[in-house]
């Protein structure tokens, strides 16, 4: 019984570690202003994109959700803590078009990037 529990625990740790490695690679690419496409992330982890996708599926994780999560965090940080233009932020975090960024911000934050910036800066720190 203890051996089985240990195996289950180790499997969970391995799965968690893989997702974390993928997220770290995504974050590195986005922070460098590069596109976090699955091919680039897979190459950074020395595997094919199909293997990366299969391993994430095994953990019930979807690649684009990980990218979306990190883009959202970077957008929040840039809007809250920098004076960079909305357009510059959009391109920096991997959007091909500022209007796509605006639509995505509406989904993430419920308003435009400019409105979110005003709102977040009015909050007490």
PLM feature spans:
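Extended mid-to-C-terminal alpha-helical interaction segments
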Residues: 1-125
């Amino acid at each position: 019984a203890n051996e089985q529990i240990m195996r289950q625990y180790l499997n969970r740790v391995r799965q968690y570690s893989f997702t974390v490695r993928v997220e770290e690679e995504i974050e590195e690419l986005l922070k460098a202003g590069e596109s976090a496409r699955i091919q680039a992330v897979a190459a950074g982890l020395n595997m094919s994109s199909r293997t990366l996708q299969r391993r994430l599926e095994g953990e019930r994780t979807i690649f684009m959700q990980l990218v979306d999560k990190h883009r959202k965090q970077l957008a929040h940080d840039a809007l809250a803590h920098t004076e960079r233009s909305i357009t510059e932020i959009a391109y920096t975090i991997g959007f091909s078009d500022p209007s796509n960024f605006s639509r995505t911000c509406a989904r993430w934050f419920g308003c435009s990037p400019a409105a979110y910036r005003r709102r977040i800066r009015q909050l007490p720190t």
